[in-house]
Amino acid sequence: MADEEEDPTFEEENEEIGGGAEGGQGKRKRLFSKELRCMMYGFGDDQNPYTESVDILEDLVIEFITEMTHKAMSIGRQGRVQVEDIVFLIRKDPRKFARVKDLLTMNEELKRARKAFDEANYGS
């Protein structure tokens, strides 16, 4: 009889703690669903993946970004996260480090191309 009384209480506590895909955030607006669906399809998933899969992946992405941001804030200057802080955090993960280097290089190339295009169009 005591066990029967504990089970409903346990379930209620579990729901309050936030067990499940929401990760304690309750029902929140999904920010990256469209992009994640496209990425999942690009990596070989179905064109219309299960909503639950997209939601779980989004929770993982947001958790990763949040943790990285908190770590970057703790090692860098107060109140600012800089690119160097992120690079420092991922320096021991070769795949992430290489990808960030590639993205930073492409960003610089795009900046130079835009500058050259603007100079050609508007003449300096």
Curated annotation (Swiss-Prot):
It comes from the Eukaryota. The keyword Endoplasmic reticulum does not apply. Residues 1-16 have a biased composition (Acidic residues). It is found in: Nucleus. GO terms for cellular component: nucleolus; nucleoplasm; nucleus; transcription factor TFIID complex. GO terms for molecular function: DNA binding; protein heterodimerization activity; RNA polymerase II general transcription initiation factor activity; TBP-class protein binding. It holds the Pfam family TFIID-18kDa. Keywords: Disease variant, Intellectual disability, Nucleus, Transcription, Transcription regulation. One of its GO terms (biological process) is mRNA transcription by RNA polymerase II. InterPro entries: Histone-fold, TFIID_TAF13. The keyword Lyase does not apply. Residues 1-28 are annotated as: Disordered. Residues 31-74 form the Histone-fold domain. Component of the TFIID basal transcription factor complex, composed of TATA-box-binding protein TBP, and a number of TBP-associated factors (TAFs), including TAF1, TAF2, TAF3, TAF4, TAF5, TAF6, TAF7, TAF8, TAF9, TAF10, TAF11, TAF12 and TAF13. Interacts with TBP, and more strongly with TAF10 and TAF11. Belongs to the TAF13 family. The binding of TAF10 and TAF11 requires distinct domains of TAF13. PANTHER family: TRANSCRIPTION INITIATION FACTOR TFIID SUBUNIT 13 (PTHR11380:SF5), TRANSCRIPTION INITIATION FACTOR TFIID/SUPT3-RELATED (PTHR11380). It is linked to Intellectual developmental disorder, autosomal recessive 60: A disorder characterized by significantly below average general intellectual functioning associated with impairments in adaptive behavior and manifested during the developmental period. MRT60 patients display mild intellectual disability, delayed psychomotor development, learning difficulties, and poor overall growth with variable microcephaly. The TFIID basal transcription factor complex plays a major role in the initiation of RNA polymerase II (Pol II)-dependent transcription. TFIID recognizes and binds promoters via its subunit TBP, a TATA-box-binding protein, and promotes assembly of the pre-initiation complex (PIC). The TFIID complex consists of TBP and TBP-associated factors (TAFs), including TAF1, TAF2, TAF3, TAF4, TAF5, TAF6, TAF7, TAF8, TAF9, TAF10, TAF11, TAF12 and TAF13. TAF13, together with TAF11 and TBP, play key roles during promoter binding by the TFIID and TFIIA transcription factor complexes. This is Transcription initiation factor TFIID subunit 13. It comes from Homo sapiens. The gene is TAF13.
